Design a protein with these regions (language model features):
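ABC ATP-binding cassette signature C-motif
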Residues: 1-151
């Protein structure tokens, strides 16, 4: 199987001490892994390091050349609260591609159980479970090779 991501000697230091030290692993196409740990042990931080949102204190993350990665956020960003579900799903795409991909956003939202009427509602009206499904659709719209899910 082809390698999608390689983490080498990752170290993340916080004000409370190290979260992880010399963490190394490889993710290949078809791999499915889960992280289990107590609150504050670094699970979300690791995902942020893997997707480039946060730089490690030391170490490196390498992504395969044509690999597209997406991370499902843990919480709905406040900036999306005034957007419709459709707008929120299309937002991760380049502006010039959004109209052409509207059909895909509608299909993803329908597969997640949203009706056309709900797709036009503001995201602030959603329950917690509905927000989680919306966040998954936001990641899937990019058709990633590697999907990182945070809770």
């Amino acid at each position: 199987m082809s390698t999608l991501l390689t983490a080498h000697a990752l170290h993340v230091e916080t004000a409370f001490g190290p979260l992880f030290n010399t963490l190394s692993f490889t993710l290949k196409k078809g791999d499915r892994i889960g992280l289990i740990g107590h609150n504050g042990c670094g699970k979300s931080t690791l995902l942020q390091v893997l997707d480039g949102t946060l730089a490690p204190t030391s170490g490196s993350v390498s992504l395969a050349g044509q690999c597209l990665m997406a991370r499902v956020e843990q919480h709905l960003p406040e900036a999306l609260h005034t957007q419709s579900l459709l707008q929120a799903v299309l937002a991760p795409l380049p502006a010039d591609a959004r109209e052409a991909q509207r059909w895909l956003a509608e299909r993803l939202l329908a597969q997640m159980g949203f009706t056309p009427a709900v797709m036009e509602q503001q995201t602030a009206t959603l329950s917690g479970g509905q927000q989680t499904r919306l966040l998954l659709a936001r990641a899937l719209i990019r058709q990633p090779d590697l999907l990182l899910l945070d809770e």
